Amino acid sequence: MGKTAVFNEERIKLPDFLIGESKVRKYVLDASVVFKWYYKKNEVDLCKADILYNFLDSKEYLLFAPDLLIYEILNAFRLKEEIKNEIIDSIVSELYDAIFIIETDKGILRDAFVHARTLNISFYDGIYIALSKKLDAPLITADKKLYRLGKDLPHRIIMLSDFSEK
């Protein structure tokens, strides 16, 4: 079936030029970064997260995340009772409209497991690394442990605090 993504709540086939040969900058984001877009209380590096949020309206950047991101964001908000259900609905809609949400396939799952076992990280974190590798796009994270354990991988992992759009 080739490379596909869910965008605007519809499955689309991603043309190879969009993934491989585009001059557009591509990034994979994990939930630790995206969460900061919607919840500011006791969070750090909000300015850097806001830069990435502003990329949503840019034609120069493509932001990707595995479908796992939606589950992690919803789970993080589960205990934030001050965030009303209507707000959660709009967050989910915005994420599907603005980020290319990539369905995890067998290849990503297999690669994620290898990374999880090799780096001693969660399988969930391994999914972000595997997607980053598959798309040949840097992974941006605010997770210090993930960064520390994955920074020496051949594909780039960028700590949010170190992110620069240059």
Locations of regions flagged by a protein language model:
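Acidic, PIN/NYN-like endoribonuclease modules and their adjacent C-terminal/linker elements
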Residues: 2-26, 55, 102, 129-166
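Short beta-strand scaffold positions
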Residues: 29, 64-65, 103, 123-126, ...
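Phosphate- and divalent-cation-binding pockets in alpha/beta enzyme and binding domains
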Residues: 72, 111, 148-149
